[in-house]
Swiss-Prot record:
Its cofactor is Fe(2+); Mn(2+). Gene3D superfamilies: Divalent-metal-dependent TIM barrel enzymes (3.20.20.150). This is Mannonate dehydratase. It comes from Yersinia pestis. Coiled coil: none annotated. The lineage of its organism: Bacteria, Pseudomonadati, Pseudomonadota, Gammaproteobacteria, Enterobacterales. It is an enzyme of class 4 (lyase). Its EC number is 4.2.1.8. HAMAP family: UxuA. It catalyses: D-mannonate = 2-dehydro-3-deoxy-D-gluconate + H2O. One of its GO terms (biological process) is D-glucuronate catabolic process.
Amino acid sequence: MEQTWRWYGPNDPVSLDDIRQAGATGVVTALHHIPNGVVWPVSEIKQRQAELAAKNLVWSVVESVPIHEDIKTHSGNYQQYIENYQQTLRNIAECGIDTVCYNFMPILDWTRTDLEYELPDGSKALRFDQIAFAAFELHILKRPGASNDYTAEEQVQAEAYFNAMTEADIAKLTGNIIAGLPGAEEGYTLDQFRARLAEYDGIDKAQLRENMAYFLRAIIPVAEQVGLRMAVHPDDPPRPILGLPRIVSTIEDMQWLKETVDSIHNGFTMCTGSYGVRADNDLVKMIETFGDRIHFTHLRSTCREGNPKTFHEGGHLQGDVDMYSVVKAILTEEQRRQSLGDMRPIPMRPDHGHQMLDDLHKKTNPGYSAIGRLKGLAEVRGVELALKRTFFPELKQ
């Protein structure tokens, strides 16, 4: 696997020097300063590449080229935004980058309710609390019909949770959910968020699938022409939230995506932390079934709690993800590719990490502190090395 590291650009508290010292050789980044829907100029892409090259690093994967909401709703200026997206892909390929990660989650990117959940050892993790989220939907956002998405017991618990909140608690929870986490290019006020939600009235799972299919039929031929591997990231969490459909959550969704545009360039980001939230997602089976379409991996683990929809992020070798078996399956796919002459290792990044040690006293991007990810990368690297020595001696060390 190619060891990579996500970097949010010059304003990221984690520097390129830090990344190099972590042992990563590739960087996963994007042009975060360019608004959604605007073409990425070749000059801007090359400038970012030069910044990385100055530190002996390469831009391995683009994460992400955000998809404008007009494309997801198939409304407004969606056709122009698709054409802009196509041109951005051409420009990325012109600069020699061959992998693009993206997602098709409506409105929000990945979602958490607590960005500072304290673990027994004193480190901090990200957490999604189903009851806190219900309290937000039912009593803060006051989304019409939200009660239909929660059990009677969850509604009682949510009301008690809300009644115990201070104004500061309400503001913090609201900000955590709608203000935009790292990688999400847009944040909202409550009124703006309600207006965005209204744009999805009448868009169910079938319609969102059709909108995504239209997008894929437009951009995958471009990816084929220029040699780009598109790698869709799963929904996080992998289920409908806020009354919005989500369509990249299960192995059935992966099969639908494959069949919709059956091209090797129409592939997946295997995010074990996103898919792994669902107990019914067999991660190894997913890798074995769609191995040739997995162009990028995010390796992390989560811990499901008493309410199966509540989870927090565990250590990379802990929690509900069997990282040993996952890495073994990825290496098996790499071995298959190398036997066919494809020597490019699958890019992997240690996704998220606990805020720990000295990082507890620093300003960090939630989930993207340096030391927690350094620990995760070292752990995954150790698993990979042990597996290669034991089972895959022919793979490039």
